[in-house]
Amino acid sequence: MIVTQDKALANVFRQMATGAFPPVVETFERNKTIFFPGDPAERVYFLLKGAVKLSRVYEAGEEITVALLRENSVFGVLSLLTGNKSDRFYHAVAFTPVELLSAPIEQVEQALKENPELSMLMLRGLSSRILQTEMMIETLAHRDMGSRLVSFLLILCRDFGVPCADGITIDLKLSHQAIAEAIGSTRVTVTRLLGDLREKKMISIHKKKITVHKPVTLSRQFT
């Protein structure tokens, strides 16, 4: 199985269909759990559509978002990195309705051994996720919720943004509740803060999609 730069990882997953346990397509509605911390790490996932939230759950019940995964992301790969069988470390939840491919971890491990180029593709994706996790940690370090919200919007611009005439549109339908859960706030607070940004012409919202006008100006003023 030769991996070329223009071949999506999704196609690589599908080419594993000749194995005894072929990849399967799964769908999850928003807020549905894909796996819990402590679940056996038996499969690797490839995100076809939508966005997935990875979070850590602590003993006090607090849940901290560490990453938002976009289409063409691979996740559930900790056992591949450590070389040891392990349980899930994160709570993976559908941030939007999602469609994904999953394959047994043994098959993915074999594919990585046979295809160094595939390993590089996955490594690039993991590097991007590490950067996003660092940015999320910085976001949650803000005590001021206004700064926290703006930092989160800028992360979404980076990872889900589509350039448009008015700025950058975040290509996700975001409810106020979903944003609140991601930044550790409340829906009421998020609604108020988004309203303030709209009044200042910093953002606009159409059909739950947020457009950020002049992201650089926004970052300088609020973060």
Swiss-Prot record:
One GO MF term: DNA-binding transcription factor activity
InterPro entries hit by this protein: cNMP-bd_dom, cNMP-bd_dom_sf, Env_Response_Regulators, HTH_CRP, RmlC-like_jellyroll, Tscrpt_reg_HTH_Crp-type_CS, Tscrpt_reg_NtcA, WH-like_DNA-bd_sf
Span of domain HTH crp-type: 143-216
Keyword Protease annotated: no
Gene Ontology cellular-component annotations: cytosol
Gene3D superfamilies referenced in this protein's UniProt entry, alphabetically: Jelly Rolls (2.60.120.10), Winged helix-like DNA-binding domain superfamily/Winged helix DNA-binding domain (1.10.10.10)
Record keywords, A-Z: Activator, DNA-binding, Transcription, Transcription regulation
Annotated region of DNA binding: 176-195
Function in brief: Required for full expression of proteins subject to ammonium repression. Transcriptional activator of genes subject to nitrogen control.
Protein name in the entry: Global nitrogen regulator
